Amino acid sequence: MSAEHVLTMLNEHEVKFVDLRFTDTKGKEQHVTIPAHQVNAEFFEEGKMFDGSSIGGWKGINESDMVLMPDASTAVIDPFFADSTLIIRCDILEPGTLQGYDRDPRSIAKRAEDYLRATGIADTVLFGPEPEFFLFDDIRFGASISGSHVAIDDIEGAWNSSTKYEGGNKGHRPGVKGGYFPVPPVDSAQDIRSEMCLVMEQMGLVVEAHHHEVATAGQNEVATRFNTMTKKADEIQIYKYVVHNVAHRFGKTATFMPKPMFGDNGSGMHCHMSLAKNGTNLFSGDKYAGLSEQALYYIGGVIKHAKAINALANPTTNSYKRLVPGYEAPVMLAYSARNRSASIRIPVVASPKARRIEVRFPDPAANPYLCFAALLMAGLDGIKNKIHPGEAMDKNLYDLPPEEAKEIPQVAGSLEEALNALDLDREFLKAGGVFTDEAIDAYIALRREEDDRVRMTPHPVEFELYYSV
């Protein structure tokens, strides 16, 4: 879509406002809204100035001016605002050079795709992420000097089997780890997910399926079709926006926290990916599980750099409450056909054209632009340096005897470990100027602040364990 087409849309849809959106370092969408009459052809060349010092991990107050540069191809009508509003996604540019800001996640993703093409290895990378989420009826939490608390409730929660409701308790709720694929009334979110699908398609996503997920208390997934990397990261931001707002309309609250509840499955964001050149799938070949040698090297790069990738793909302290054995969490850095206990799976496909790999450790708290770019850069490093991943592991890795299990590397066990790994293993990200040291250092500092706060805050479980010592 061109700027000319956007200007036509403004008239055809009688648009009153234009909502300029961008993504901060942590992955949260931000926006500023302007009257539609301010948008003309020059707007798409000049952009809009804003204060970059107010975004965590970005500019200092002494050099705060930055440019929001609209990408006309992303224009879409907002389905939620009362007044007709057009959303346009923006890149963050330096005002002096009009080059992409080195800490802007979307600019980083675009540089990664440019680097892919510059290597000559491939011209396209396709991503198919699968973010999961919870829908709750009520959530209360807080942390202050006088104490900490969190309380989750949902009518689907297994703990509500004996709860007294005004209209009676109707039962029909999924048990712990019992939520995968039941029909209503056990699956209480059917209509909510259907509405999410309709709105997502209205906003340009292609929906393939939706269903209840494994956990009790409203764990769900909407599956959407793959796309090229930056476009798919854009779509993940739309996906989250739709899930949050449709849930809100239904009187629910949605969360993409990786592990909101102890004792049941957490939410992942498995990432399917493949490389293509001139329309040919480069991951299809005659090696293990129908993969090419390039695909194996790509896997080798992801495994080699996995702990550094964790800092971007599993970016919260909560992420590592999911990455523990026993809850379908892919902690073992191995690859296998069909085997879901491995961190990298090769799905069964109907055609060699669909051959791909699935990296299973990322979670939906990740900034999609940074997560996808890191996975791509690790894979390209594997191809360039011919890093073979070793033999495939086709056995259930959760059932291995301890002496065998300790020989298999694992993902990072904490955010601190992941950030330390990123600090020491960053050169693969800097190839082609995709990530800079400044961007990586700022990211690490931002996440260490969160890690320090969690580490220093007394936890309710500590009172259970230690109050009476």
Curated annotation (Swiss-Prot):
InterPro entries: Gln_synt_N (IPR008147), Gln_synt_N_sf (IPR036651), Gln_synth/guanido_kin_cat_dom (IPR014746), Gln_synth_cat_dom (IPR008146), Gln_synth_gly_rich_site (IPR027303), Gln_synth_I (IPR004809), Gln_synth_I_adenylation_site (IPR001637), Gln_synth_N_conserv_site (IPR027302). SUPFAM superfamilies: Glutamine synthetase, N-terminal domain (SSF54368), Glutamine synthetase/guanido kinase (SSF55931). One of its GO terms (molecular function) is manganese ion binding. Binds 2 Mn(2+) ions per subunit. The keyword Transcription does not apply. When cellular nitrogen levels are high, the C-terminal adenylyl transferase (AT) of GlnE inhibits GlnA by covalent transfer of an adenylyl group from ATP to Tyr-398. Conversely, when nitrogen levels are low, the N-terminal adenylyl removase (AR) of GlnE activates GlnA by removing the adenylyl group by phosphorolysis. The fully adenylated enzyme complex is inactive. Mn(2+) 1 binds at E130, H270, E358. Its EC number is 6.3.1.2. GO terms for biological process: glutamine biosynthetic process; nitrogen utilization; protein homooligomerization. ATP binds at E208, H272, M273, S274, R340, R345, K353. Keywords: ATP-binding, Cytoplasm, Ligase, Magnesium, Manganese, Metal-binding, Nucleotide-binding, Phosphoprotein. It is found in: Cytoplasm. Mn(2+) 2 binds at E132, E213, E221. GO terms for cellular component: cytoplasm; membrane. The modification O-AMP-tyrosine is found at Y398. It is an enzyme of class 6 (ligase). This is Glutamine synthetase. The lineage of its organism: Bacteria, Pseudomonadati, Pseudomonadota, Gammaproteobacteria, Enterobacterales. The gene is glnA.
